[in-house]
């Protein structure tokens, strides 16, 4: 669908999506993702349907708080607190020492990797001799390489499941990718062609399933890091891909002991910034009351 829109030069449609609508969509997505990760963060064993509407997930999560596991919650909540503490510390350092601002930025960008590695080592020390009965939930075995490579097969029952979610998926992909492209185009003083962007992301998602890939779209965090690094062309994506390939074939065994609660903390931390403060809505109201209502 996305590739067709790009080939049909329908990218101009994106320009008609108002900023408040994009903001509201991103906030809603962030709330949905965060609410679905609380179960893993606390190690809850209750029957919580994380694919249900956000309000239902929040209600079920609160009801099932007694099922939270202490060790899982500790690994998740401490990791989440550490991520925010590191970010605040590096931001404070950048403000106090502007000459080292870029160094603090890169240290802040690496905080997620540091926390995952730290808690994986802690988990290794605790669970090394009790793999069959770990103290808390672990990621477990991660297959090496492209074990799912092949011609994808879409069955009728799978199509029925995704049809109802397809419009939301397309809108989410469009908004996120174009938002990333426009943001960094504005920062680095270049103009993007929305139709060209749609063709690129559409073809990527057409070829991805042959290697067992998840649907792809623009990434705020990685784009920010590349922009700060001085990247000026898509060639940086090739460098990233090579590093990921090496990791897929050599480092997967090291992922076994990563606590699931820590991964939930990382996800919540990553998407939490998409939830805008209340004064943003007030600013929309000052500019255009109708847009704020929308």
What are these regions (language model features)?
Residues 1-294:
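Transmembrane helical cores of multi-pass ion-transport proteins
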